[in-house]
Amino acid sequence: HQYAGYSGGRKTVAVGAAGEALIAHTHGPAFIDHPGTRLGRIAGNPFHEAITEAAWRVRLRFILNIVLDDDKRILRVAAGEPDMAFNELVNFARSVYEVPIPHQYDIAIGGVGYPKDSNLYQASRAPSYLFFAPTPVVRPGGFFIIPARCEEGAGVGAGEQRFFNAMSQAADVQSSLEDARRNGYPPGQQRAFVMAKVLEQTQVIIVGSECPDLVTASKMIPAKTMAEALELAAQ
C-alpha cells in the first residue's frame, strides 16, 4: 500500500478489514498531504502509524506474510509477532525492490501492466507511485509517460467513477486540491486528490488510450504513440 510505506502486516486489519470511516480518515487530505506519507517510508509515516495502532487495538497477534517477485513467486516468508515479522520482510523487500535515485529526471516512462492498464483509475497508479517516492522521480515541470489502453474508460466501480467525476468536474487541478482540503471526499475519490497533487507539479501523458477524450477530461494528455508522447514532452 503506497501510503503505508510497505503493505502487509498491520494492513491486514486496516485497511483490509476496516470500516469505511477508518478508511476515509486514513486516506484523507491530512494524511496524503503529510511529507512522511511516501512509498517505502516507515519511520515518520503517519499512515503507517495510524494503521499500526488500529491493528494493536484489535489485538492482532500473529501474521504470516510473504514477499513476491515480479512473476508472483515467493522469495521470503515470515510468520509470528506482527511487528517482528513485518519488519523482517520490509528489510528484505528493500534489498529487492528499492533502487537509489541519484537525481530527479525530466521524463519517466512506466506502466502498471495488464490488467491494471485497462482503466484510467488503475493506470494512474504508475505516475503517483513514482511521484510519492521518498524523492519524486520526476522534477517539477517534468513528464510521466504511461502506456495504457484504458479500454474500460475510467473504470466501472464506485470509487473509479468518483475519481473520474472529481477529476473531470474540477475547473483545474488547483481548485480540485482546494476543494478536497476544504470538504474532504468519500473513499475511492482519494485517487483524484493524489493525481491532482501529481499534476500540480508535473504533467502526465497517457499513450495508446482508447478513450483520449476521457484522458483530456481528467487533466492528463493523450498521445497515440510513444514517439508522439516523447515529442510532446520535449517541446
Task: Locate each region found by the language model.
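Short, solvent-exposed amphipathic alpha-helical segments in soluble enzyme
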Residues: 5-16, 79-83, 123-132, 161-164, ...
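C-terminal non-catalytic interaction/assembly regions of soluble proteins
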Residues: 127-235
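Short, glycine-rich nucleotide/cofactor-binding loops
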Residues: 113-125
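Short, catalytically relevant binding-site loops at active-site mouths
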Residues: 71, 114-117, 151-153
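Conserved, well-structured core segments that form the ligand-binding/active-site neighborhood
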Residues: 1-104, 136
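Short glycine-/acidic-enriched loop or helix-start segments at secondary-structure transitions
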Residues: 3-7, 119-120, 155-157, 216
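Structural motif
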Residues: 106-111, 145
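N-terminal glycine-/serine-/threonine-rich phosphate-binding loop
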Residues: 94, 104, 124-125, 228
